[in-house]
A protein has these predicted regions:
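C-terminal transmembrane helical hairpin of 12-TM major facilitator-type secondary transporters
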Residues: 297-344
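Conserved MFS/SLC helix-loop-helix module at the cytosolic interface between two early adjacent transmembrane helices
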Residues: 59-98
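Extracytoplasmic
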Residues: 9-43, 114, 245-250
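Extracytoplasmic gate region of multi-pass secondary transporters
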Residues: 28-29, 224-282, 341-345, 376
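Cytoplasmic helix-loop-helix junction between adjacent transmembrane helices
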Residues: 103-143
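Helix-breaking motifs and short loop linkers at transmembrane-helix boundaries and internal kinks
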Residues: 40, 72, 93-99, 110, ...
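A late C-terminal transmembrane helix in Major Facilitator Superfamily
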Residues: 352-387
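Helix-loop-helix hairpin linking two adjacent transmembrane segments in secondary transporters
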Residues: 138-191
């Protein structure tokens, strides 16, 4: 008898969760030009505004991971989404640059547990053989949210105003919260989940992992693992490039390529639309090709490193004159920037030996990504102000991609969440 697949509805809701989060992020990027005009902002000030939600996002990341480990992803998801949706709506009602920064900080507080929620939910709801595909499918919500959000937000701005674009997109999040609260709990408690599927999930999600004899090693134990730092650095290099394009691509197309608001939204959509399919296909192939032994050995790091090498395509952008050529290179870089983080998230699950540390490990991974990511809009703003072009900004992102590939290959191996053996218990070498 074939096992049902109702768990996919959880992944679909998380896909929408991700899409909504990224529509709310790209809204500021598309609206950047009219906001800068209304408040008289320089490229440097605009860079700080683009980055501002990440300040709170990064600061609240580790506390968010602890909340997930304590209360569960399903509970934290609804509270976090309500907070960030309220902040998104408030952004459309501000009267000054200072109050806009405060609203963006509220968005960061709400979105801080967003990625650990997704990663933790996948680990709770999927067999290990589906882990990479599930995370890639959920992560595809980010690229699809950007692909659809950019032109829709551009249309809302041209049709109504930049203020209404924030109010409308923020309201969508509250609809998602109502659906999530009505349908989702844990696999053990969700009533609409067939018993056969429940047993499959519970029996196979920790396949190959010895049942832990402890509650976890906590943040202190995780940061002692070289693998955690390899994941941290590679995720940072991936997310830096992702935020460069998320924050500045519409503005780049409007100012450097002289496209209209609506056309900049349409061209921004192209790389992220392609990235939607690329992320699912590449990570799905990884799941198919990796054996259980390869998963436990951390072989998924090769997919992470390959993604980073493709992401370095951005180094060639300054040497290409045609708009079509630039969009093609950006599409390669953005697609790679969506394949890599999903693979890295699955790799954390592969290497983790203590389920009690799942929320903290995923939070630390995302902290690495966004520690680098919050710098991307600011660094780019200074570069554009100093040079009058985006060329050096693309070069910085390409160089970081190469650094990340080395970190993934050299460090992201071994295990996470194991207590070291006491010195007296270790076997002695023969004399």
């Amino acid at each position: 008898m074939k096992t049902p697949h109702r768990r996919y509805w959880v992944f679909f809701l998380l896909f929408l969760f991700t899409a909504i989060a990224y529509v709310d992020r790209v809204n500021m990027s598309v609206a950047g030009k009219p906001i800068a005009h209304e408040f008289g902002l320089s490229p440097i000030a605009l860079g700080y505004l683009f980055s501002s939600f990440l300040w709170a996002y990064v600061l609240m990341m580790l506390p968010g991971g602890r909340l997930i480990d304590r209360w569960g992803s399903h509970v934290v998801a609804s509270v976090a989404t309500a907070i960030w949706s309220a902040a998104q709506m408030a952004t459309g009602m501000v009267g000054s640059f200072a109050t806009m920064l405060m609203a963006r900080l509220g968005l960061g507080i709400g979105e801080a547990p967003f990625a650990p929620i997704s990663y933790g939910s996948v680990r709770a709801w999927s067999p290990y053989t589906e882990r990479g595909t599930a995370i890639a499918a959920i992560s595809a919500g980010s690229s699809l949210g950007l692909a659809l959000g950019a032109p829709v937000v551009a249309w809302l701005i041209e049709t109504l105003s930049w203020r209404w674009s924030f109010i409308i997109t923020g309201a969508v999040g509250f609809v998602w919260v109502l659906v999530w609260l009505a349908l989702i709990s844990t696999p053990e408690k969700t009533r609409w989940l067939p018993q056969a599927e429940r047993e499959l999930i519970l029996a196979s999600r920790d396949a190959g992992v010895e049942p832990p004899s402890h509650d976890g090693v906590g943040y202190r134990g995780l940061i002692r693992c070289p693998a955690m730092w390899g994941l941290f650095i590679s995720q940072g290099c991936l997310v830096y490039t992702g935020y460069l394009y998320l924050s500045w691509l519409p503005n780049y197309l409007q100012t450097a390529r002289h496209l209209s608001m609506l056309n900049s939204g349409i061209y921004t959509a192209i790389p992220f639309l392609v990235a939607t399919a690329t992320g699912i296909v590449a990570n799905g192939a990884g799941d198919k090709l990796l054996t259980a032994e390869a998963v436990r050995a951390g072989k998924r790091r090769y997919l992470v490193a390959l993604s980073l090498l493709f992401m370095a395509a951005g180094l060639a952008i300054p040497f290409v004159q045609s708009l079509a050529g630039v969009i093609a290179l950006i599409t390669i870089a953005v697609s790679a920037a969506h394949v890599g983080p999903a693979a890295n998230g699955a790799l954390v699950g592969d290497l983790l030996r203590s389920p009690g540390d799942a929320g903290r490990a995923f939070a630390f991974l995302v902290l690495g990504g966004n520690t680098f990511g919050l710098l991307a809009p600011i660094v780019t703003g200074y570069v554009v102000a100093a040079t009058g072009s985006f060329n050096s900004a693309f070069a910085v992102a390409g160089a970081l991609a190469l650094v990340g590939a080395v970190a993934a290959l050299a460090l992201a191996r071994g295990t996470l969440g194991e207590h070291p053996q006491p010195a007296l218990a270790r076997p002695r070498l023969a004399d």
